[in-house]
């Protein structure tokens, strides 16, 4: 069985973190993003798993909840305040062509699409952005 990096993150700048206790990271990528949020001077507030977005599961037909990984407030390069909801995902979970013939991967991809559409709609109604960040975005891999 694969071991995943998990643990509690201790912010160096706890005044920036929105939440009552130390956030939990569920992957090394989430850990790196928490560190980025904590140390980046442009990010003035951030939260982990703080938002609940309702959506209908297309496989069960039941109403359920999607909890995106992060919620951040920052100042962009033009000095404008921005807010984003962020999901950290491996690229293979974001591209249909990367699912291959594996049925489980295909179902996982399809469910992600429904969750992310709900997140986009929720964010649009609040005037904020939704972004999916992959390893290519975080670590600039893939020839960029």
Task: Give the predicted meaning of each segment.
Residues 1-144:
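Electrostatic, structured charged patches in enzyme active sites and in nucleic-acid/phosphate-binding
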